[in-house]
Design a protein with these regions (language model features):
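Hydrophobic residues embedded in beta-strands of well-ordered beta-sheets
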Residues: 2, 150-151, 213-214
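Conserved N-proximal alpha/beta basic substrate-recognition cap immediately N-terminal to
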Residues: 2-90
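Short solvent-exposed loop/turn micro-motifs enriched in small/polar/acidic residues
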Residues: 26-29, 135-138, 198-201
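A short beta-strand motif that forms the metal-chelation/ATP-contact edge
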Residues: 41-43, 96-99, 143-145, 212-226
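Glycine-rich phosphate-binding loop of ATP-grasp-fold ATP-dependent ligases
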Residues: 63, 72, 96-120, 139-142
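Phosphate-binding site of ATP-dependent enzymes
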Residues: 110-194
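C-terminal active-site "lid" helix and adjoining low-complexity regulatory extension at the edge
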Residues: 181, 195, 199, 208-271
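Hydrophobic residue at the +6 position relative to the catalytic HRD Asp in the kinase catalytic loop
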Residues: 204-206
Length: 271
């Protein structure tokens, strides 16, 4: 038995789309409705419920790593992959963006211009906080990675380009990026960050200013709202079912072929 394991209110549409187009019989279970059956292979879709399986993709520990935005930001900061970030109030430089340890969907974000506004933002964080430099980004991408290779890339177009958080749940849209148009500096940084996470698959959020790409976070249950992205993920997951899990080495060409997942090489029409 092979299935996706999701939790309530997370990943229903994405998981059902993968199941519908899988050629290897991938199923799906919701952790709060059924006790997950013993399986040969389980893909954890942001779900850390107990499960018995011979092989598991996205270990509980890795999901916890990226869900703790503060601790993972420390990892990214030490590697120079994210905006300059501060973890102590006295170190913060302005303007700065303050966020709590855990957050999602572009919520719980405060832009601070001075010490009083910083203290007010910190007081709104019931837990620890981190603050990062405010980047006037010109573009933002989500890079979908499976087994260390890129399955697809989407660019975010916000409803309000002046907003700090470009989150599609608050308006705006994703548009698929064609292979030849993949921004290679973004792809390179995304793969580096992904390999630090311990995940087997996920969505890496990247913002861009000039030639510089900055990692924001990694999602262990990336929303697949496009039929194209759904098919890309399904192809990559079916590849794992047929050939086994494990990280795939990068190619040698200095173009998209260096990074693209081998399951995606066959042309998929962009919808």
């Amino acid at each position: 038995m092979i299935y996706l394991l999701r939790r309530r209110n997370l990943g229903k549409g994405s998981c059902n789309a993968i199941v519908a187009s899988s050629t290897t019989g991938i199923g799906v279970f919701r952790s709060d409705l059924y006790y997950p059956p013993e399986a040969d292979l389980v893909f954890r879709w942001g779900c850390t419920a107990p499960v018995r399986a011979t092989s598991i993709l996205n270990k509980v520990e890795a999901i916890h790593v990226v869900s703790d935005k503060l601790e993972f930001r420390k990892v990214l900061d030490t590697q120079g992959l994210c905006p300059k970030t501060w973890f102590q109030e006295e170190d913060v430089k302005f303007p700065a963006v303050v966020r709590p340890r855990t957050h999602h969907q572009g919520r719980r974000l405060w832009v601070c211009q001075d010490r009083p506004s910083l203290r007010a933002a910190i007081s709104r964080c019931a837990e620890d906080f981190y603050a990062s430099e405010l980047i006037n980004k010109t573009a933002e991408y989500r890079v979908f990675v499976v087994s260390g290779r890129v399955a697809c890339v989407a660019r975010k177009f916000p409803a309000n380009p002046d907003a700090v958080a470009w989150n599609v749940y608050q308006g705006g849209r994703f548009e698929n990026v064609r292979w030849d148009d993949w921004p290679l500096p973004v792809i390179k940084v995304a793969v580096r960050a992904f390999l630090l996470s311990g995940l087997d698959f996920g969505g890496v959020d990247i913002m861009v200013l000039g030639p510089k790409a900055y990692v924001l976070e990694i999602n262990s249950a990336p929303s697949l709202t496009s039929p194209y992205r759904q098919r890309c993920f399904t192809k990559a997951f079916d590849w794992i079912v047929q050939k086994g899990k494990g990280f795939l080495p990068l190619g040698t060409r200095e173009n998209y072929r260096k990074y693209i997942h081998p399951a995606i090489i066959e042309r998929i029409s962009d919808e």
